[in-house]
Amino acid sequence: SKNKRLLKPVILSHHMLLGLKGESKMSKSDPESAIYMDDQEMDVNRKIKRSFCPIEGLDKNPVLQYVKYIILEIFKVVSIVRKEENGGDKDYDNYAELEKDFLSGSLHPGDLKKAVSKYINKILEPVRAYFKNNPEAQKLRSLVKGYTK
């Protein structure tokens, strides 16, 4: 019947990101292995700076996954800030070119991580502002946090 069709559950799924330490997936038991919606800027910066970012085994590189599956999907262009002696700033509008430069060594993991931190923080800023300015959201957040301890 029509009512049954309206009540069917919907599942929204996405690519499962690797854990930041190189694990096959993020772990709720290790807060350093994932970026959370309520992470502060300094948390994101620390986590990305310490993250696993190998040049070999690109399919095991969580930093590149953030670029491919999140950042480029939202921003369409990733700007990497680099010193002039390292080739200067460069914009990437596709993942393949960024990956090629990363593999060749012309894109250093440190420069990539700084850019990823910047973009993840841009994504999270409206969430942070919402929770900061909304007492009801703060209460709900505290309630959820209570379940994760």
Labelled PLM ranges:
Residues 1-149:
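Conserved nucleotide- and phosphate/pyrophosphate-binding catalytic cores
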